[in-house]
Amino acid sequence: MRKILKIVSLLILLLLLVYSFFSPNSQLFVFVQLIIIAFLIGFGINCFVKKERYQGTLYFVIAICNITINLDKINELIQSI
């Protein structure tokens, strides 16, 4: 049941990401990116708890790459608040 819930929530996030990518509102895109980064960090911590270090490291690397790619947009969002 938990796996189905994770898959459904990730699919909803994917749809939100695609929608926000084509919408003129860039803040929505950054918010969705931050939510995805939070999920990736959570999955990475969960993998480290389960002693799956390779997958945990992979989640953290993907999250860090996502942060560095969108760093300018994140800074713009923080300054606009």
UniProtKB/Swiss-Prot annotation:
Where are its TM segments located?
Answer: 29-49
How is this protein situated with respect to the membrane?
Answer: Single-pass type I membrane protein
Mind naming one GO cellular-component term on file for this protein?
plasma membrane
> Does the keyword Amino-acid biosynthesis belong to this entry?
no
Q: Which UniProt keywords apply?
A: Cell membrane, Membrane, Signal, Transmembrane, Transmembrane helix
Q: Does the keyword Disulfide bond apply?
A: no
Q: Extracellular face: residue ranges? A: 25-28
Localization (cell) = Cell membrane
Residue ranges annotated as Cytoplasmic topological domain:
50-81
> Could you say which residues form the signal peptide?
1-24
Give the protein name, as stated in the record. Answer: Uncharacterized protein YosU
Which gene is the coding source of this polypeptide chain? yosU
